């Protein structure tokens, strides 16, 4: 049976008219795993929600390498049609966290400092530059430690890993080296494929199915350093509250999950942004506008980016070494808005306006650019040390 036929039989529809040939990853020898998989696929195929334990078990089945491409396609297709629940997201994320390579920075934890992540889902297909990556350096420049989780481009021209490489940052570091970056520089990059190596078992099915899947949502939910504060952009407004609730269940203390009215998975400067705020275990939803941050509105066209080289040039201009070469326009403003949210989430800033003021100081003092330069130099140095060691 082809994966297309399997998906049709399971869901009653053709998923995005996708033809996916069935290729098995291997035999399942444990009869309990066979039973779990068949029961789970039957349940979700009928449009019923999985329990947290069932979702955990399904992801365990995938990450352990027992699942076939056909099973993974069926699961992802059914979830796409049915829609994910908080319990399912928490179950999937719990299994991914269990399999993840952990990062253990020590200095911030010893001092009781927050650790921030600005990882979003990606997938908004708007072609903007890497706003959350630029914002991460602004946050670090303001004195808040950052564990930036990210990946290469999947649905856009340039992912966070791509632009960081173009900025001179090594992304192929060992876990201990990433922890040193966070401890000594104040910011480190957690390259998702290296941190979540077991997700390789799902890559073929994901690519063959095409489009966004639950794995897009799981990135912000599975920070390997256990970030306590987050700003997570989502590609669809309906996911904001769902993701905020899941983050709370997973132990994050404060978060802003955002979706711009112009379709951005960032806080927008073009108009309204939907916000789901997690604080003290509760989630509330509201909208913000650029004026709340003391910023001018600007159209989407003014913040578009390009490939990794072009986006790196934009970030260099936003974080310019001198006032003469520093950009003062929409690129800078959207970075300040998103950095402000991360600073509020961390507790460093008291509100949006205070956050923008701190973000502006981080840029104009040169501190944000210093963090970028320091991470590039340090990552190159430690990567070189590990390769020259006997």
Positions of predicted regions on the chain:
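N-terminal basic, low-structured, amphipathic or hydrophobic segments
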Residues: 14-19
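Charged, compositionally biased N-terminal leader segments and the immediate start
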Residues: 33-46
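Glycine-rich anion-binding loops and their surrounding alpha/beta cores
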Residues: 43-45, 50, 98-101, 106-109, ...
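N-terminal glycine-rich anion-binding loops that anchor highly charged ligand groups
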Residues: 48-89, 99-105, 334
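Active-site cofactor/substrate anionic-group-binding motifs, chiefly glycine-
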Residues: 85-147
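A generic, well-ordered mixed alpha/beta core segment in the N-terminal half of proteins
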Residues: 120, 124-173, 177-181
